[in-house]
Amino acid sequence: MDGNPDVHGKTIRETLHRHEQVIVSTYFAECGQLAETLSQSANRVGVSAALAARIDSYSAILPGAQALAPARHDRMPYRVFFGQIGERLKATYEGRPNAYQNPDELLADVGCAADSLLENRGRHAGYFLVRRFMRRVRTFGFHLATLDVTQHAHVHDQVIAQGLGLADWPAMAPEERLRQLRDLLARDQGPTSALDAIGRRSLWVFEAIAQARHKFGGRAIGEYIVSAAQGPEDVLAVLLLARWADITDKRTGESPLDVAPLLECIDSLERAGDILRALCREPAYRRHLAARGNRQMVVIGYSDTNKEGGIAASRWALQVAQVQLLEAAREAGIKVLIFHGRGGTPARGGGRTENLVEAVPDGAIRGVLRLTEQGEVVNQSYGLRPIAMRTLERTFASVALATAHAGEKPPLPPAHAAAMQTIAARSLAAYRELVFGSAGFFDYFRAATPLDVIERMHIGSRPAARAGGDGVRALRAIPWVFAWTQSRHMLPGWFGFGSGLSAALEQHGDDVVAQMVAHWPFFGHLLDDVEAMLGRTDLTIASHYDALAGDALRAQAEVIRREYALTVAHVLRLRGSARLLDSDPTLQRSIKLRNPYIDPMHLMQVDLLQRWRKTGREDRALFGALRATISGIAQGLQATG
């Protein structure tokens, strides 16, 4: 799915089956603990008639539970009952008769025990433990964790092209595809041409979603995310394919999917409000939304927008898109939930969650926050129980405060918006001039970073580059950021920001920009992130990597050095500091302590790269050593992609 050929309908089913086994095993263990704890004797404490009836019923159909319980436990009804629940959970795990068909059946059993405890002097004799078990069942069901499904919009177009026998479908104007989709949905027309294996496999995903929801509950599957969405036609395409897969409601014709467009380029973010308005004007989709509670999720992508336009233009496009989405949703009378698809590093939107919450536009967070947590940073935030609890506490506190004070943020001064627009526009121009407009830049990038090693390491769930393209545009965001991190250029985290600040200071004045730093959390946190990336940048180390590119490509390195010097000068001026990160001494000290250990690994990596490339990239021993340096530098910097 979305670039990973190993993810398909079978993967969804197998993943949820494994989820079920994990959570059912956990429930089974908790039942054993409850059976040990709730040892009340029927000679002293009564039980409800409903519980007594259930125990008798299960005694007849669950002989295994009866055989496992010692005879002396016969007069301990709660112990007997939770043993019976455990037997049903065991049957659920093994797929035997008498298994729980859904978590509601388990909840009914546990609830019966809770009611009996309340009725029979058990409020302080196990009731809390049983209620806690009920909360866990309500939270995790039999699905444990909700799966979102992501597919690229182009894949949907290819399947529709096959099904309609229209080879030029992907190349059609968006307006024409939208018109035809509108007509196909109105006529409920199925495919008129046979699908190949890839097309059938795409429809099997929809069938797997329907089966998963039937077996594991409605919460087993979350959003169906359409990546690289450009307009309403990319969302309507999903509704059409759902009909072709025959998973729609036979009575109403509505799809059981929550479809979320992923806006991951600057152009689509700039049109975010118009896209949502156009989508809400489509009769078929408006009926679909009504059936889903008039709730629409939109995913905004931090990673590819940064690769496309640099950090300042990316962050501003994301901010403006959120304002537009909130306004469009208000006009349409629906609720929009913004899903922040961010990466692990500041260049890809990473950082403290509370900073993200504080920086979003007023009203963008009302009791709910959806964001991605990248695998490479999960251990930092959740690896130890105390750290995980601290992460959750800080996240909950920030969301609670944002919700409580929604509608109270002062309006953004026009002067601040104008200055930020200037920063974004000028930084975008500087970034694109280097990355996309400079001859030989991609050759320089490949030579002056260990990208060729990273590509062969097969890190992550998808190939390093998208099929059918070349250059920076085809490269995925993770290897793009990771390669610059390894060489200590850290370019995606700061390049262009200095040029943007120069333009803003010249056109709008020092006072306006200083006010933005002091009173606008969005800009303050952007400045924090840029300064942190500048603090990790080491152009002395980077110069050794630049030497690998040779004299013919040295002009690229000079442009980077000039922009770095400009950006550092402006950041220090705005901070009123003599050194980078004087305002964050903890991070400053951490970098200073780590550098002596990391720097030798960089020098080793440069030497190994030179030797490995001379062998035609065939020497496996050198490649193994390069892998070790990449891992060591990543651990030392605590940063990947």
Name each model-derived stretch.
Residues 237-238, 348-353, 461:
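Flexible, glycine/threonine-enriched loop-and-boundary segments that flank and lead into catalytic domains
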